[in-house]
């Protein structure tokens, strides 16, 4: 049985990079203040800790997540839970999400 999400997720599609035990690039397909789904050809494992840099549209500087934990893995994608984010970056993420109109299913 899975644990329900605490935060809404929004349909998005933009690039991101991640680093940690594994580093790579991917595309974020849904995003909330608590985490995101990324599609990438780079392999990660459940439990891996990563830093994530979200290259959100119309912003010159990526939103940086200091620590995120891989919660699930599929063939070409994975889900991360955001564990640590600076307050300034959290506010940027929340402003971006407030402007999104489509909830992820």
Annotated model-derived regions:
Residues 20, 30, 70-72, 84:
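A residue-level detector for short acidic-glycine micro-motifs
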Residues 77-105:
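C-terminal output/interaction extensions
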Residues 1-31, 94, 98-105:
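N-terminal helix initiation/capping motif
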Residues 12-46, 51-53, 77-79:
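Short strand-loop-strand
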Residues 38-40, 50, 62, 89-96:
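A short, polar/proline- and glycine-enriched secondary-structure boundary/capping micro-motif
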Residues 64-75:
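Short, compositionally biased
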Residues 27, 67-69, 81:
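Residues located in well-ordered beta-strands
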Residues 20-23, 59-66:
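Short coil-to-beta-strand transition motifs
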């Amino acid at each position: 049985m899975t644990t329900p999400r605490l935060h809404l997720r929004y349909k998005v599609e933009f690039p991101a990079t991640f680093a940690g035990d594994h580093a790579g690039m991917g595309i974020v397909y849904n995003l909330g203040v608590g985490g995101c789904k990324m599609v990438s050809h780079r392999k990660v494992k459940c439990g891996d800790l990563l830093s994530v840099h979200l290259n959100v549209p119309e912003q010159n500087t990526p939103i940086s997540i200091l620590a995120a934990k891989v919660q699930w893995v599929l063939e070409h994608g994975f889900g991360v839970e955001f564990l640590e984010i600076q307050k300034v970056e959290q506010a940027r993420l929340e402003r971006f999400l407030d402007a999104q109109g489509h909830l992820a299913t």
